[in-house]
């Protein structure tokens, strides 16, 4: 599990080391980690050191010093390195070490801005060391002009071979929310120090960061049981976490003990949503899927998935461990009634799409809402909070958490990064899904995966403990696991080209086979 922290948490963790005079030690560890990633990027791209050039963009703070020290290490390996100082003053000791190694420090001004921007664009590698975790807001003044010029010039190149690595975080990315303040130089990789920052796991920050590399500089924030350990502000599940929470079939199991998921989905207008959701649930592994809905939809489902037990009954008459309601269920009074019954049943329930409007003011955390940004906007508006969809997309963790605390539900907010938030404050962010999954029906398959996990774990009180999480994070962790499985299945499907979500179930099974191996 990847734990992420706010900028304030990381800075607070550094204070004892700085007070003890170990600031330079932390800086050298950070710089070395940055150098290793930058040098490996050059090597992996086929660039030899003595034929490569790098430009280090240097701000006034410690972030700029880290970048300069990394640049000095590149010089040792034979890379030609130039530093562009965007501030009047930069870290004097780092600048001196860099210069002694043969590096040039050029101070940016209006006269040389075009030439220095062109130099950066022509280089093999740029290290962005302008703003760090202590910065608030985006780039200003001449630094902003430089990045804008680089972005414009790099975009005009016929083939973008320029590599960019960000030092701690890309300049212009909010360290906590991930919101972007333009201009931002998007990175191929970000090397962050001490621990991951929440802004690098969500929203535009994750997109701008590229591949995330965390360098351990000895703060001990993520060491279990240590005095220096800190409660994460955000988490990201990894494959081994899914293996820990997934319920494997046991000797003596039968279809009822393996988990029964009731599904009230689909309508005359959108029958396919029910087919996709039930298929994904079956592929995830459980004892039985019971479908409640229109006979015409049931006929289609049974033609594709004959093992699904279909009826036109009500929730109260159906034996299930959990419910999935809402996918494709629009303008259907019977499906709306079933959604209300499932939400009121006291059983865990996944509430998607058309059923979101049936959620009462307050529910339990075992009610998992799965809106996209537009649906979350509507849900918040009905509770007196007026927010634009664009604002939700810019700061998804903030608004998913707000919705969870407002309703008492667990909230899974779909998007480029999938955010799950518990009403007790725990937040997860998953980013495995490829852009190919941004297609109709993708959310239906995600809800089916989640429904199956919820049904198999409905009577399992040990999920949180197995993951080392607070009990209140149980359903948020299960939702994050569903997002991870969905994303990895999408990645596997995308290996052969555009993704058709109807073909996703076999990939769900193969992903789980690898995870559980």
What spans do the regions from the language model cover?
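A short, aliphatic-rich alpha-helical micro-motif
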Residues: 119-124, 184, 317-319, 343
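Short acidic-hydrophobic sequence patches enriched in Asp/Glu that either
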Residues: 90, 142, 183, 441, ...
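Short Asp/Glu-rich motifs
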Residues: 92-94, 117, 176, 300-301, ...
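Internal gly/pro-rich beta-alpha loop/helix module
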Residues: 124-125, 130-232
């Amino acid at each position: 599990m990847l734990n992420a922290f706010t900028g304030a948490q990381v800075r607070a963790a550094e204070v004892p080391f700085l007070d003890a005079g170990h600031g330079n030690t932390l800086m050298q560890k950070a710089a070395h980690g940055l150098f290793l990633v930058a040098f490996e990027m050059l090597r992996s791209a086929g660039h030899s050191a003595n034929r490569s050039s790098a430009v280090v963009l240097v701000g006034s703070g410690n972030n700029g010093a880290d970048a300069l020290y990394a640049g000095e290490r590149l010089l040792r390996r034979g890379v030609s390195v130039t530093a562009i100082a965007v501030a009047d003053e930069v870290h004097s000791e780092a600048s001196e070490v860099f210069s002694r190694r043969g590096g040039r420090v050029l101070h940016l001004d209006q006269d040389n801005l075009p030439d220095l921007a062109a130099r950066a664009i022509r280089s093999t590698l740029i290290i962005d060391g302008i703003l760090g975790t202590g910065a608030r807001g985006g780039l200003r003044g001449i630094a902003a002009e430089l990045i804008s010029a680089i972005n414009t010039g790099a975009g005009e190149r016929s083939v973008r071979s320029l590599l960019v690595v960000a030092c701690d975080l890309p300049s212009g990315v909010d360290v906590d929310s991930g919101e972007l303040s333009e201009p931002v130089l998007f990175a191929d990789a970000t090397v962050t120090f001490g621990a991951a920052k929440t802004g690098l796991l969500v929203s535009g920050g994750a997109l701008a960061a590229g591949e995330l590399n965390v360098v351990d500089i000895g703060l001990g924030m993520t060491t279990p049981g240590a005095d220096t350990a800190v409660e994460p502000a955000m988490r990201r599940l990894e494959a081994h976490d899914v293996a820990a929470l997934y319920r494997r079939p046991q000797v003596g199991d039968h279809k009822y003990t393996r988990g029964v998921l009731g599904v009230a989905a689909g309508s005359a207008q959108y029958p396919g949503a029910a087919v996709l959701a039930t298929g994904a649930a079956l592929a995830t592994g459980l004892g039985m899927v019971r479908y409640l809905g229109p006979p015409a939809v049931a006929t289609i489902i049974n033609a594709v998935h004959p093992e699904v037990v279909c009826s036109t009954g009500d929730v109260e008459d159906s034996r299930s461990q959990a419910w999935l309601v809402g996918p494709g269920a629009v303008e259907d009074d019977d499906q709306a009634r079933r959604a209300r019954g499932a939400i009121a049943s006291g059983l865990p329930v996944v509430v998607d799409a058309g059923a979101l409007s049936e959620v009462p003011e307050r529910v339990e955390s075992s009610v998992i809402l799965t809106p996209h940004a537009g649906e979350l906007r509507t849900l918040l508006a009905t509770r007196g909070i007026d927010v634009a969809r664009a604002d939700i997309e810019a700061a998804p963790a903030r608004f998913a958490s707000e919705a969870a605390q407002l309703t008492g539900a667990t909230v899974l907010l779909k998007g480029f990064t999938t955010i799950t938030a518990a009403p007790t404050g725990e937040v997860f962010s998953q980013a495995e899904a490829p852009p190919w999954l941004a297609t109709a029906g993708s959310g239906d398959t995600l809800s089916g995966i989640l429904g199956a996990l919820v049904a198999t774990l409905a009577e399992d009180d040990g999920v949180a403990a197995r993951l080392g999480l607070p009990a209140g994070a149980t359903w948020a962790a299960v939702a994050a696991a569903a997002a991870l499985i969905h994303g990895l299945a999408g990645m596997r499907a995308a290996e052969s080209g555009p993704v058709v979500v109807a073909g996703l179930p076999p990939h769900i099974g193969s992903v789980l086979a690898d995870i559980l191996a």
